[in-house]
C-alpha cells in the first residue's frame, strides 16, 4: 500500500525575480530534472515523487508567482496572473537557475503549458518530457464532464470572483474533488496556506481557469497551445505520457490524440486530475526509469 508522506520535499530557496521573491526546491547534483506544478498547487505536489529521482540529477521544483511560497503580485486584479505574466516570471526564474543543456521536464496542469512552451523555445536543451493531466491541445466545452463543466463556466463568468476569491472553491472543492483518496487535514492545509486570505491573494486560482483554451478563447492562449502541440506531434523528443484512469482533462478524443505523438512511452495509473496525490510511487518509478534510459542513451 502506498504511504502518502505529508512533509514537503527539500528545503525552500528563494530568488528575486522582477522585484518579487520566488520560491523553489533545488536538491542534488547533475543534469536538471524540473518538476512544474499548475493550479492551485505548488512544489508540494511533487513531495512523494521527487525522492524516486534522487541520485539521477539535480531536482528542481518552482512555485509559480502568487502560488506556494512565492510572493503575490501587487497591485492585483482581473488582469494579473495571466498566462503571459506567469510565463515571464517562471522563465526568468529558470534562466536564473541555469538549468543547463540536458533538462528533463516533469509537467502537470498549467505547468505543462509552461513547460511545453519553454521546450519549444529551447529544443536543443531538453532531453525528454514526462507529462500527466496536461494541456495538450485547445479544448471545447464538450470535452468537459458535465459535473465539472458548470463549475469552470462559472469561473469564466462574473460569478468567478465570489467563487474563487471569496469561497476559495478551487482549493476547497476542485482540488479534493479531483483526487481519489481523501487528503489529510495536514495535506489540505499545505495547499490552503498560500490562499488563506480571501480576496486578491486568491486571484491566481481564478486567472488560471479564465486562461484555459476553450472554444477559441482566450485567443492568445489557443494560439500558444497550437504552436507547441504542432511541434510535439512531430518531434522525436522522448516523451513519457502518464495516463490517469479515469483522468479529467486527458480523456476521450484528447487521450486518443496525445497517443499519436511520436517516440512516446505510456503508463496508466489510478487518478483523476491531481494524480500525484493518488499514485506517487508508480509515477516516481516510471519517471526514474524514463530518466535512466535517457541518461544511458546519452552516455551520461
Swiss-Prot record:
Q: What is its EC number?
A: 3.8.1.5
Domain spans labelled AB hydrolase-1 = 32-155
Keyword annotations from UniProtKB, A to Z = Hydrolase
UniProt KW Hydrolase keyword: yes
Q: Which domain of life is it from?
A: Bacteria
Q: Which residues are annotated as active site?
A: 109 (nucleophile), 133 (proton donor), 273 (proton acceptor)
The record's InterPro entries line, in alphabetical order, gives:
AB_hydrolase_1 (IPR000073), AB_hydrolase_fold (IPR029058), Epox_hydrolase-like (IPR000639), Haloalkane_dehalogenase_2 (IPR023594)
Residues that span the membrane, as ranges: none
Reactions catalysed, as given in the entry? 1-haloalkane + H2O = a halide anion + a primary alcohol + H(+)
Question: Carries keyword Hydrolase?
Answer: yes
Q: Name one GO molecular function term.
A: haloalkane dehalogenase activity
What does the subunit section of this Swiss-Prot or TrEMBL entry state?
Answer: Monomer.
Function of the molecule: Catalyzes hydrolytic cleavage of carbon-halogen bonds in halogenated aliphatic compounds, leading to the formation of the corresponding primary alcohols, halide ions and protons.
Q: Which family does it belong to?
A: Belongs to the haloalkane dehalogenase family. Type 2 subfamily.
Which named protein is this?
Answer: Haloalkane dehalogenase
Organism whose genome encodes this protein: Mycobacterium bovis (strain BCG / Pasteur 1173P2)
Amino acid at each position: 500500500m502506498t504511504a502518502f508522506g505529508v512533509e514537503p520535499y527539500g528545503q525552500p530557496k528563494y530568488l528575486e525575480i522582477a522585484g518579487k521573491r520566488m520560491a523553489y526546491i533545488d536538491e542534488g547534483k547533475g543534469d536538471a530534472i524540473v518538476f512544474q506544478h499548475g493550479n492551485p498547487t505548488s512544489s508540494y505536489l511533487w513531495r512523494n515523487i521527487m525522492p524516486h529521482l534522487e541520485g539521477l540529477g539535480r531536482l528542481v521544483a518552482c512555485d509559480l508567482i502568487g502560488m506556494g511560497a512565492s510572493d503575490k503580485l501587487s497591485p492585483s486584479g482581473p488582469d494579473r496572473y495571466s498566462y503571459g505574466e506567469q510565463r515571464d516570471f517562471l522563465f526568468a526564474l529558470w534562466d536564473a537557475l541555469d538549468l543547463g543543456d540536458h533538462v528533463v521536464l516533469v509537467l502537470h496542469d498549467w505547468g505543462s503549458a509552461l513547460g511545453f512552451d519553454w521546450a519549444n523555445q529551447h529544443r536543443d536543451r531538453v532531453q525528454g518530457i514526462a507529462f500527466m493531466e496536461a494541456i495538450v491541445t485547445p479544448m471545447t466545452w464538450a470535452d468537459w464532464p458535465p459535473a465539472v463543466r458548470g463549475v469552470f463556466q462559472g469561473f469564466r463568468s462574473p460569478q468567478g470572483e465570489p467563487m474563487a476569491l471569496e469561497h476559495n472553491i478551487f482549493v476547497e472543492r476542485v482540488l479534493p474533488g479531483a483526487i481519489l483518496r481523501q487528503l489529510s487535514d495536514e495535506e489540505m492545509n499545505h495547499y490552503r496556506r498560500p490562499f488563506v486570505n480571501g480576496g486578491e491573494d486568491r486571484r491566481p486560482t481564478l486567472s488560471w481557469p479564465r486562461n484555459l483554451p476553450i472554444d477559441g478563447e482566450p485567443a492568445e492562449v489557443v494560439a500558444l497551445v497550437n504552436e507547441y502541440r504542432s511541434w510535439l506531434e512531430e518531434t522525436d523528443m522522448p516523451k513519457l505520457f502518464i495516463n490517469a484512469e479515469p483522468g479529467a482533462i486527458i480523456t476521450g478524443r484528447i487521450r486518443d490524440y496525445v497517443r499519436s505523438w511520436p517516440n512516446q512511452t505510456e503508463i496508466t495509473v489510478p487518478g483523476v486530475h491531481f494524480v500525484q496525490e493518488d499514485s506517487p510511487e508508480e509515477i516516481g518509478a516510471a519517471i526514474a526509469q524514463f530518466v535512466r534510459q535517457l541518461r544511458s542513451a546519452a552516455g551520461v
